[in-house]
Amino acid sequence: MIERRRDRQADNFNIDQFGLSTVESLLSAQLAQNTLPVIATGGIASANDVMTSLMLGATITSSAGYMLNTLMTHGEAGLIDEIISWQRALPRLMTLLGARHLSELPSKPRLYASNLQNFINQSKNATP
């Protein structure tokens, strides 16, 4: 949200439409057999997004843009309410997934939407 408020150049280049989504980036890191810590940032706007990122191998997640927007639109009390909501939701999501520890999340079964399955298939078949 903050980035979107910057003045656009005359060519109307929109960085929001360029590159991979957070989920696609995490899947790419998995497909590349990455062994380094991965930070998921950009597009993290819910406890579900945090859980998805952790399941896809993120070591850390960041939702600074979302939280700043919440602070700007709903004030400090709204931000605190949102953080508390996430703190309540994350353990519930882990219970639904049958995970006692964060380290278990990447090994939990998951289903992919058709567009993500297509991304995975094309990425596996891509030549370097």
Feature-to-residue mapping (PLM):
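Alpha/beta catalytic cores of nucleotide-metabolism and tRNA/nucleoside-modifying enzymes
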Residues: F13-T35, A45-P128
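Active-site loop ensemble at the mouth of alpha/beta enzyme cores that anchors a bound cofactor
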Residues: M1-F18
